[in-house]
């Protein structure tokens, strides 16, 4: 099978290697000529993985959309949410047959605040869309690239497509489960980034493990409350795209959102981070989207509200954490 992977960042490169390890013909699209040359000649992607990690030498990196996607059986979208629309616009002229599109991003559309699956399926003509799935869950690229055992989900409304993508990616170090709850899976992996920033802030403010465990647990309550309102299923939030992704993202140095929170916490302000940060930190935008939707539909989400005030109203993280801790006492079920 030919697979075109759009995006030569950490996750795109890691997924490209998985597919190459599974004996597929993989073309990896980059926007940077030096990165293409390094991948093809030295079999490294040093910007993201350093000089010590070598990647599968069969990966073919390219600057050309045509080379990457033409005649591909599958196309993997491994780019930040802000780039999804432009990427689809650029690749569509080269799609000549029905193709399965696989989304690997976590977040919301930048123009409409819709879930990514909804927008991607709207942008691709029906006669070119053989199927759609999301490959998501608790998978840090830094571990997948060195072939550490990882488990994620192939999520699609069409169970046959979910199974097809499951087989495409599964091997002895990447175990893929299927899921048909598109709403729950997408909301779970998106909102957990907000909680991960909050967890990092606690670390930056020198709170302990007890505090972070409590915050992450209460954060799961908020994810479930929001997700159920919009049609997600409880079992999804208890699975890999829910609590699984939440656990790994809220506690790992590999998580950009967690690292962002640590910086914000140490500064006791988001101002410098937002001004100078160059990494893709999806949780920042997701905070605004989820806050606005929760406010519109009267969904109780105090952690998300506090994060919105920190990121968008320049509230002091230390004050917001105290406000959350001092909320009225209630049952844990609430």
Model-derived regions, located:
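Rossmann-like NAD(P)(H) cofactor-binding subdomain of soluble oxidoreductases
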Residues: 55, 62-70, 74-147, 165
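NAD(P)+-binding Rossmann beta1-loop-alpha1 motif at the extreme N-terminus of oxidoreductases
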Residues: 1-53, 59-63, 90
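Conserved active-site and cofactor/substrate-binding residues in soluble primary-metabolism enzymes
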Residues: 6, 10, 14, 34, ...
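Structural beta-sheet core signal
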Residues: 5, 28, 101-103, 134, ...
